[in-house]
UniProtKB/Swiss-Prot annotation:
This is Coiled-coil domain-containing protein 121. Keywords: Coiled coil. PANTHER family: COILED-COIL DOMAIN-CONTAINING 166, COILED-COIL DOMAIN-CONTAINING PROTEIN 121. The keyword Transport does not apply. Residues 253-278 are annotated as: Disordered. Residues 1-30, 105-243 form a coiled coil. It comes from Homo sapiens. Transmembrane segments: none annotated. The keyword Coiled coil applies.
Length: 278
């Protein structure tokens, strides 16, 4: 009986120890389960985060690629439009330059005509001086001849034997002298009028030629200035086109150097299926 009680007590003591150990194990189990849940949640969150990260990177890549492509297309469109405008302006300037070349050719013809007119002006001036000199010489000759004839008639009328001449003879001589004077005056008058008319005509032609020469000179100067202006405008347009081409080349290089992969990055299988279920 005593042994039985002893065994019962031992069994109760062992049972109590086992219960205590069982409770301790249960507490440790709960603690481990709590820690496991925490790590499981942490791992789950990290797994979802890492799983979503490639998709975010891919979406960011697509967005940046689309933005870069849009900017590239806008730049290309602006560049093409500017080039078109510049080409149109350059074509207009080439047409103007072609027209200017034709005008310059006409200007050369005008210069030749101007040189010819200047020679004609010089010839007319020389002829005018020559005619004036000849007129003065002939006038002096006629005056000398008339003066000589007048003196001869006066001598004949004043000779001592004039009493021997009849009244009729004297009247004839007087009439002849008067007629000679009138003829001389008429000749001188008509000759002077003719010379004056020729001089007036020469002056008129000379003024016309001088006026034409002045107009030709003004036209030539205007065409030369216009030619220089068009050459400067053409040089400016060509420089502007070259500058825009260099600027576009630099812009394209900047776009190519941006942090965008040249090839489409491959996504994880799970991300691809999430983006495109097909």
């Amino acid at each position: 009986m005593t042994d039985l009680n002893k065994h019962i007590k031992q069994a109760q003591t062992q049972r109590k120890q086992l219960l205590e150990e069982s409770r301790e194990l249960h507490r440790e189990k709960l603690l481990v389960q709590a820690e496991n849940r925490f790590f499981l949640e942490y791992l789950t969150n990290k797994t979802e985060e890492y799983t979503e990260q490639p998709e975010k990177v891919w979406n960011s890549y697509l967005q940046k690629s689309g933005e870069i492509e849009r900017r590239r297309q806008e730049s290309a469109s602006r560049y093409a439009e500017q080039i078109s405008v510049l080409k149109t302006a350059l074509l207009q300037k080439e047409n103007i330059q072609s027209s200017l070349k034709r005008k310059l050719q006409a200007m050369r013809d005008i210069a030749i005509l101007k040189e010819k007119q200047e020679k004609e002006i010089q010839t007319l001036q020389e002829e005018t001086k020559k005619v004036q000199a000849e007129t003065a010489s002939k006038t002096r000759e006629v005056q000398a001849q008339l003066l000589q004839e007048k003196r001869l008639l006066e001598k004949q009328l004043s000779e001592p034997d004039r009493r021997l001449l009849g009244k009729r003879k004297r009247r004839e001589l007087n009439m002849k002298a008067q007629a000679l004077k009138l003829a001389a005056k008429r000749f001188i008058f008509e000759y002077s009028c003719g010379i004056n008319r020729e001089n007036q005509q020469f002056k008129k032609e000379l003024l016309q030629l001088i006026e034409q020469a002045q107009k030709l000179t003004a036209t030539q100067s205007h065409l030369e200035n216009r030619k220089q202006q068009l050459q400067q405008e053409q040089w400016y347009l060509e420089s502007l086109i070259q500058a825009r081409q260099r600027l576009q080349g630099s812009h394209n290089q900047c776009l190519n150097r941006q942090d965008v992969p040249k090839t489409t990055p491959s996504l994880p299988q799970g991300t691809k299926s999430r983006i495109n279920p097909k």
